[in-house]
Amino acid sequence: MAEAAGGEQQLLVILDSHGIIFRSYYALRDVLPPTRTQESISAVYGYANSLLTVFKELQPTHVIAAWDASSATFRKERDERYKATRDHAPDDLVPQFARIREMLDAFRIPVVMKEGYEADDVLGTLSEQAHEQGTAVIIVTLDNDMIQLVRPGVSVYMYRPYQKDYILYDPDVVRERFGFEPERMVDYKALLGDPSDNIPGVKGIGEKGAKALIEQYGTLDEMIAHLSEVEPKRTRTALENGLDEAQLSHELATIVRDVPDVVLDMDSARLRDYDRQAVTDLFHELEFRSLLPRLPASDGDDAVAPSNEPEGDYRTITSRADLDALVTDVRAAGRFGYLVVADSAHPVRASQCLVGIAIAHDEGQAAYIPFGHAVEEQGRLLADEGEPDDAADSAGGQLRRDEVFEALRPLFTEPGLQRYAHDSKYGMLALGMADASMWPATDDFDTQVAAYLLGDANMSLQRLAFTRLRVDTVDPKTFLGTASKAIPFSKAAVADVARYACIHADMVRRLVEPLREELDEASLLGVFTDVDMPHVPVLARMEQWGVGLDREVLDGLDRDLTSRIAAAEQAVYDAVGHEVKIGSPQELSHVLFEEIGLPRTRKTKTGYTTDADALEPLRNAHPVVEAILNWRELTKIKSTYVDTLPGQINPQTGRVHTVFSQVTAATGRLSSNDPNLQNIPVRSEVGQLVRRAFVASDCGEDPVLLSIDYSQIELRVLAHISEDEELRKAFRARKDIHRATAANVFKKDEADVTAEDRRRAKVFNFGVLYGLTAFGMSTREGIPRDEAEAFIQAYFEAYPSVQEWRERTVEESRERGYAETLLGRRRYMPDLKSRNRVVRQAAERIAINMPIQGTASDIIKLAMNRIDEELLERRRSGALARMILQVHDELIFETPRAELDDVREVAKRLMPSIELAVPLDLDEKVGRSWGEME
């Protein structure tokens, strides 16, 4: 960013800072996660992005940032309504102002402000002075108020959020866009008003009327002077009645161009050699990885921003001698990071399309061993033994896969070496299912799991390397392409894949120690070492086994659902009296709320919401609602499962292999995808029909499924954590907890508790885990608010320690910034300190739920780890039973019937993995299919 040359035309850019800051914040706050230190960065990122765009697109010689000094301005004194509807800056935005000032200082861009005036007035004054000096000016803003400043030599560069681009307003563009001269924008605002600034305008005059008046009379003064001539009459009447408001609005909308003591200093505004290191350090701290390459050069720098990719001894191994030497080096180092490269992101499918392996045994020392790259102009894969040597030569000397596996097998299977990976479950499955002898021993460190425990919102290796090591990795999209033009790894240049893979493995190797230190400092190393890392191979084996699927059951269900959906459609048509596009929210909204006249739900852009939560309370209001909800359930089940499951059967195994993730849910719960087997409805008839398609198979003689689930585990955890004696006594006595709760709350004998009493007690027993409020209960149960409040009061009188625990947990979590489980797993929640009541209360509900749901998840994980270890040992002795699914509180085993009693004994002995103050009861079912278990 060098100084302008002697005779170069000067261009001053003035930034409407607060406009950019607020728009950036609201546009990005739900898109851009906080940094790993929980710092909100949406406004800073948006401002930085705008600034770098200005540097590139406008190439200014001078830049000034106009700033609001405070909210107290002469306009506020003139009219207390001015901007009165605006909320205070959100809590997480306030600290970002200082960060932006820090960034501007590093870029050596002066900030100009004046007490009692807004940034708009500073902009107006500076642009006026620059114009008088003959300097070209461009104002960067998102506010069309600035258009009044446009003239020859002064332009406005305005961001259009919906088009996601900028438009440069000069006088010609203003006339084309608005139909009047730039200086008439003040008169336009005087008539139309400005809701964002709470400028009233003239009631009864809209955009069309305002433009017509300006076209005929020009200024507001001329309109007033010819008031009796204004037509039509309704416009004249509106103007007569709103004359005072129009004149006030004109005054408020006028940008001051002569603010006292604001003097243009072109010398300080000149873009000089900026502090590139300070900007780079700040961008690293704020995790602005994508912005670093866009930094302009400063004096003494190259024009192109230097690459921050790591330098190292990265090699491609194509000979057995070099491969053996690598193995020797790794053995000497005693540890290594690795990456398995394959053409599929699904770990089981990856085993069938392996491309290569990268290994890093020391910092900056990594090698890539290709064996599955396309040969003969990327026409086919080189994979297994038996491939002719000349084919290997035509693939650039790739080794055969069997030869690579033979050499690397000791590194992955011997217990003495430490193995590190990012998403090590993927590598385990890809290697182990490609060749059973390559199934890795347990990895010692998974950088993805570590980042998850530390609360990183973005757990990608790219982000971890950037935030911890200040290093850029290679994005594979740069050589694989994207969307329809994307190619697989096997068809990419070996050199490109090698560099990417070596850097990846090297970064994994380098990240282990800093992440281990962070885990230790946060007291999370125990959870990492004792719970989550041992859980990785458990999930890998469950994915390896997969689940059997009966195609005939699915085919029959497909025919059944097709018939039911047609009947449900007809039921909707009959209830409405004509056909309707049930899948169109807009058309459905019109039918329900305009034609039928049902109570209106929440307003949307296209009508009123028709989502399930909104329609459920209306189920009994009209027959069409029941029919719509039925149609939706049937079509969702059909499209999500019945139509897609057959295509997800692995042709090599004949089974469905879901992908489990322990790094998705913030509470530590597992999630399942591709396909998601955890969201099949459990209580609906059609959900049970889908579950019937999942069957025991390929597991010895007379295979069966055994389901064992924890009975009300979260309520039992609540009884333990809250130390509520009434709750504990009920569980210890093996009582029906919902009946016991109803008896306590309604002050009845348990024998007198009705089904409705019990149902309502059950709602709140579970609702208390999620912070259910009187409003929530009133809405859910359709009961008066005061009745819900009375029930909640009676509940906490019955279980006073639960209420005390809830209040204590929220306050402790607010003070610490996180809630935690019994084992110390954390969930960070900065929103607990939000000034926004809705945001804060939502965080409080999460703080109440996290220790309960998270502890229950920890209990289940520990149990799974221990069960898997024992079943694995039994399989070494010839047993066949295996754990194949985890669905929330339920574990499902596949076993020959002859081993059923043994598996049952193992599960029941090990599932109470943590000793609580109340017993952890278990329920069990057995059956040939998941949907038919008794």
Regions found by a protein language model. Give the residues of each.
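Noncatalytic, basic helical substrate-engagement surface that gates or grips nucleic-acid strands
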Residues: 2-140, 144-172, 245-262
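Non-catalytic nucleic-acid-binding/docking modules located in mid-to-C-terminal regions
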Residues: 3-9, 61-64, 109, 132, ...
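Short active-site loop/helix that positions an aromatic residue
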Residues: 21-27, 147-152, 345-346, 355-357, ...
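Active-site-proximal helix-loop-helix substrate-binding element of RNase H-like nuclease domains
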Residues: 110, 164-192, 196, 309, ...
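Conserved "right-hand" nucleotidyltransferase catalytic core of DNA-directed polymerases
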Residues: 238, 242-394, 456, 480-685, ...
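Function-dense linear segments that define catalytic or interfacial modules
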Residues: 358-366, 370-373, 423, 462-476, ...
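Conserved catalytic core of nucleic-acid polymerases
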Residues: 487-490, 537, 541-544, 599-601, ...
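C-terminal polymerase-core module
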Residues: 563-570, 574-626, 797-845, 849, ...
